[in-house]
A protein has these predicted regions:
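Acidic, proline/glycine-enriched N-terminal capping motif
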Residues: 1-128
Length: 128
């Protein structure tokens, strides 16, 4: 099994954009909520509910060049993974994002493309 698709949006993390609700609980920001809602439109394989071990490779192309000398902004790859995994669960691509299903995220990285930010996703079954 191999699924490939592209989410043509600037990648957004979930944790770094959170706001506190009235009860003090961390809530996703409007920026993340918009990202999730829009990303769902670009996922072609909704509701397949993968429940076997898979590798989710994600190449994140961002508007900001985090590797440019002097750039003080940073982005956390793990937070990008968390946001993507949550989107995939919401879309029904993955049954859950626990380690029994998302076995690995090998090959993932952050790159720069100011004119065409996106996330290229490849999901492949892992033989244990």
């Amino acid at each position: 099994m191999k699924l490939k698709f592209t989410i043509p949006l600037n990648p957004v993390t979930k944790k770094n954009h959170g706001v506190r609700g009235r009860n003090g609980k961390q809530l996703p920001s409007k920026a993340y909520q918009n990202y999730e809602q829009n990303a769902l439109m670009f996922i072609p394989c909704k509701h397949i509910k993968i429940n076997k071990p898979v590798n989710v490779k994600a190449v994140y192309y961002t508007k900001i060049d985090y590797f440019k000398p002097g750039c003080k902004a940073v982005i956390d790859l793990q937070n990008l993974h968390n946001a993507l995994a949550d989107v995939l669960v919401t879309a029904g691509v993955l049954e859950d994002d626990n380690c029994r299903i998302v076995y690995s995220m090998d090959g993932s990285c952050v790159r720069h493309d100011k004119k065409n930010p996106r996330t290229e996703v490849t999901i492949t079954e892992v033989e244990l």
